[in-house]
């Protein structure tokens, strides 16, 4: 999953 990398807030 790449979501965490893009939205790493």
UniProtKB/Swiss-Prot annotation:
GO terms for cellular component: extracellular region. Keywords: Adaptive immunity, Blood coagulation, Coiled coil, Disulfide bond, Hemostasis, Immunity, Innate immunity, Secreted. It is found in: Secreted. Conversion of fibrinogen to fibrin is triggered by thrombin, which cleaves fibrinopeptides A and B from alpha and beta chains, and thus exposes the N-terminal polymerization sites responsible for the formation of the soft clot. Disulfide bonds: none annotated. The keyword Disulfide bond applies. Cleaved by the protease thrombin to yield monomers which, together with fibrinogen alpha (FGA) and fibrinogen gamma (FGG), polymerize to form an insoluble fibrin matrix. Fibrin has a major function in hemostasis as one of the primary components of blood clots. In addition, functions during the early stages of wound repair to stabilize the lesion and guide cell migration during re-epithelialization. Was originally thought to be essential for platelet aggregation, based on in vitro studies using anticoagulated blood. A long coiled coil structure formed by 3 polypeptide chains connects the central nodule to the C-terminal domains (distal nodules). The long C-terminal ends of the alpha chains fold back, contributing a fourth strand to the coiled coil structure. This is Fibrinogen beta chain. The lineage of its organism: Eukaryota, Metazoa, Chordata, Craniata, Vertebrata.
């Amino acid at each position: 999953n790449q979501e965490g990398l893009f939205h790493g807030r």
